[in-house]
Amino acid sequence: MIQQQTRLKVADNSGAKEIMCIRVLGGSHRKWGNIGDVIVASVKSATPGGVVKKGEVVKAVIVRSVKGLRRADGSYIKFDENAAVIIKDDKNPKGTRIFGPVARELRDKEFNKILSLAPEVL
């Protein structure tokens, strides 16, 4: 469950290391986001020479969440950390690599490029 002021690890090589959620997109009074939801975030820490800089406002998709996500077969999937991938407006990632596992639910929301770059899809 990601809400405003939540800090997330960045799971790609776009240059950002940590982002803070400003808004969960999809509805005027939406409070929480989970895996596969798009958020607007501010870059809180970044590596020097990266594509994105500290203080930039970016869009990102949540790829890992500590809060469990219930699947249709009744099983749950949860991760050890909250993580996101910074995306462009066309749903493609800004970076060229994805680090760590991502959930299969991203396929339903048409983030196919992220799934193809990920080392493991759970």
UniProtKB/Swiss-Prot annotation:
Concerning Gene3D superfamilies, the annotation shows:
Ribosomal protein L14
User: Molecular function (GO) terms listed?
Assistant: large ribosomal subunit rRNA binding; structural constituent of ribosome
Identify the PROSITE patterns for this entry. Answer: RIBOSOMAL_L14
GO process terms (BP): translation
**Which of UniProt's keywords are assigned here?**
Ribonucleoprotein, Ribosomal protein, RNA-binding, rRNA-binding
Recorded GO cellular component terms are: cytosolic large ribosomal subunit
- InterPro entries in the record, alphabetically? Ribosomal_uL14, Ribosomal_uL14_bac-type, Ribosomal_uL14_CS, Ribosomal_uL14_sf
What SUPFAM superfamilies does this protein's entry cite? Answer: Ribosomal protein L14
Quaternary data: Part of the 50S ribosomal subunit. Forms a cluster with proteins L3 and L19. In the 70S ribosome, L14 and L19 interact and together make contacts with the 16S rRNA in bridges B5 and B8.
Annotated function: Binds to 23S rRNA. Forms part of two intersubunit bridges in the 70S ribosome.
What family is this? Answer: Belongs to the universal ribosomal protein uL14 family.
Instruction: Give the matching NCBIfam families.
Output: rplN_bact (TIGR01067)
Entry protein name? Large ribosomal subunit protein uL14
Q: What is the lineage of its organism?
A: Bacteria, Bacillati, Bacillota, Clostridia, Eubacteriales
